[in-house]
């Protein structure tokens, strides 16, 4: 059975960043990535159980606060984090061993991502992969398992369905940022500017799905995006405005919740 939970994670980092070799006017110091505190909700599901052992996966989504971010004068090369608050995502695999009736030791590996959080920085973010170790206390383990053995679900009928999604957003361009960050000198009014032209983006997604099991549905769809380049010039004005592609989609259901990939 899956579990839903919430939690906090403290990420400590001593990472330094320096791009003085790329600059017309070197900064003369090392920037720091800094530390972060993440608040998240987690979906965890054991896929395999044998005796006291189990193996499964976790998915986490939330927000994070950072003690350092990009600053043109004090942290110029931290282009990974552009805002105090960013989006947080994590996914991982684990193996667990229940050494006592209510206690389980879990070890695994996980991927952690903090978004950049700003339109005036490259869309990079901070990415980490590392080991995980957890001690889980489940005082209601036996009661939950007994309830699961007695539970009978209503009949499930397979069916087809279609989805349509519309979206609008904004884009700035990496070429604009790189020019003002590395190429122009301090005498240029665009030097280290944080103001860039934002181009609207219009998105359309549709998919035809088949729900073949209570927990899963799969299908194929079309993704289309239109980039409004009015007000731009130079190489940017020559970018393709349309992007169209086919997308294989999979949706996982749990009660009234679902996650689409």
Q: Language-model segments: what does each one mean?
A:
Residues 2-8, 55-59, 105-107, 131-133, ...:
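Transmembrane beta-strands of outer-membrane beta-barrel proteins
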Residues 51-53, 97-105, 141-145, 214-218, ...:
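Repeated loop/turn-to-beta-strand initiation elements of outer-membrane beta-barrel proteins
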Residues 10-16, 61-67, 111-117, 137-139, ...:
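Transmembrane beta-strands of outer-membrane beta-barrel pores
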Residues 1-25, 39, 182-251, 256:
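Glycine- and aromatic-enriched membrane insertion/assembly motifs of diderm outer-membrane
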Residues 91-159, 171-177:
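Predominantly the C-terminal beta-signal and adjacent terminal strand-loop region
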Residues 1, 39-45, 59-63, 91-97, ...:
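Residues on the lipid-exposed face of transmembrane beta-strands in outer-membrane beta-barrel proteins
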Residues 1, 33-39, 53, 83-89, ...:
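Residues that define the transmembrane beta-barrel architecture of outer-membrane proteins
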């Amino acid at each position: 059975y899956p579990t839903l939970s919430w939690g906090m994670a403290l990420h400590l980092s001593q990472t330094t960043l320096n791009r003085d070799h790329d600059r017309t006017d070197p900064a003369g110091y090392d920037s720091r990535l800094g530390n972060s505190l993440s608040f998240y909700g987690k979906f965890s599901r054991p896929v395999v159980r044998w005796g006291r052992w189990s193996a499964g996966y976790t998915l986490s989504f939330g927000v994070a606060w950072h003690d350092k971010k990009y600053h043109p004068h004090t942290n110029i090369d931290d282009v990974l984090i552009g805002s105090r608050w960013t989006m947080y995502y994590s996914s991982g695999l684990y193996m667990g061993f229940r050494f006592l009736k209510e206690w389980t030791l879990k070890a695994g590996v996980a991927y952690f991502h903090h978004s950049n959080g700003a339109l005036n920085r490259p869309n990079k973010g901070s990415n980490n992969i590392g080991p995980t170790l957890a001690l889980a206390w489940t005082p209601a383990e036996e009661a939950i398992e007994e309830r699961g053995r007695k539970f009978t679900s209503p009949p499930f009928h397979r069916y087809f369905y279609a989805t349509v999604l519309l979206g609008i957003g904004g884009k700035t361009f990496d070429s604009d940022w790189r020019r003002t960050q590395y190429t122009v000198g301090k005498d240029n009014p665009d030097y280290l500017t944080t103001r860039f032209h934002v181009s609207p983006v219009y998105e359309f997604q549709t998919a035809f799905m088949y729900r073949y099991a209570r927990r899963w549905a799969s299908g194929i769809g079309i993704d289309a995006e239109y980039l409004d380049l009015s007000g731009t010039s130079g190489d940017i004005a020559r970018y393709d405005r349309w992007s169209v592609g086919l997308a294989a989609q999979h949706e996982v259901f749990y009660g009234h919740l679902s996650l689409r990939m």
